[in-house]
């Protein structure tokens, strides 16, 4: 079983923000259909299941994402976990893959690492660094030029995640799917 968790913040006001690219990728994957919604209360998030694939959108707000992942991990005990999140240190449109490592200052990743460790794969989607404060920038919406490109980036990431689920080799996926801005 594989758990794919997209990080973001709940609520309409955050729906199209840079910090929610993880949620956006889960929504892109859900469009393929065939997923059943699983009771969300005990998992502190929206959980969807299709065969041996679980998709998760934590409802804990970004900085407490680990609570939701831990609940799902403890119940389902997936063989593999893939976390999708925004990355300020990568230019917009860049996509990188890694296993484990440091949180890079991302509080959602810190929360996950603190509760389940860091032995999981990560899909890092670059959002760049704006001129505003970090909080204003990550909670801001994409500009029009970025919105058009974002659709392609999300489609690219979806293909990478599906292949990662199939092959299980983050190094192979990184070689094939790393995207530069």
Swiss-Prot record:
One annotated Gene Ontology cellular component of this protein: cytoplasm
GO biological process, one term: protein quality control for misfolded or incompletely synthesized proteins
Localisation: Cytoplasm
Reaction(s) this enzyme catalyzes, per UniProt: an N-acyl-L-alpha-aminoacyl-tRNA + H2O = an N-acyl-L-amino acid + a tRNA + H(+)
Class of enzymatic activity (EC top level): hydrolase
Binding locations of tRNA: 14, 61, 63, 107
Gene Ontology molecular-function annotations: peptidyl-tRNA hydrolase activity; tRNA binding
Principal location listed in the UniProt entry: cytoplasm
Enzyme Commission number: 3.1.1.29
InterPro entries: Pept_tRNA_hydro, Pept_tRNA_hydro_CS, Pept_tRNA_hydro_sf
Site (Stabilizes the basic form of H active site to accept a proton) residue list: 86
Assembly and interaction partners: Monomer.
HAMAP family to which the protein is assigned, alphabetical: Pept_tRNA_hydro_bact
Family as reported in the entry's similarity comment: Belongs to the PTH family.
Protein name, entry field: Peptidyl-tRNA hydrolase
Biological source species: Campylobacter fetus subsp. fetus (strain 82-40)
């Amino acid at each position: 079983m594989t758990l794919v968790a997209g990080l973001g913040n709940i609520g309409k006001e955050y729906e199209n923000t840079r910090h929610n690219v993880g949620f956006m990728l889960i929504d892109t994957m859900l469009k393929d259909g065939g997923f059943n919604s699983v009771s969300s209360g005990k998992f502190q998030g929206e959980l969807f299941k299709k065969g041996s694939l679980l998709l998760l959108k934590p409802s804990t707000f970004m900085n407490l994402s680990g609570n939701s992942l831990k609940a799902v991990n403890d119940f389902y005990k997936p063989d593999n976990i893939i976390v999708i999140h925004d990355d300020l240190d990568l230019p917009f449109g860049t996509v990188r893959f890694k296993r484990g490592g440091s949180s890079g200052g991302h509080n959602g990743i810190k929360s996950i690492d603190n509760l389940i460790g860091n032995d999981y794969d990560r899909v890092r989607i670059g959002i760049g660094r704006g001129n505003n404060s970090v909080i204003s920038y990550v909670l801001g919406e994409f500009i029009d030029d970025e919105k058009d490109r974002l659709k392609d980036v999300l489609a690219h990431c979806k293909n990478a995640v599906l292949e990662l689920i199939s092959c299980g080799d983050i190094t192979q996926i990184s070689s094939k799917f790393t995207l530069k801005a």
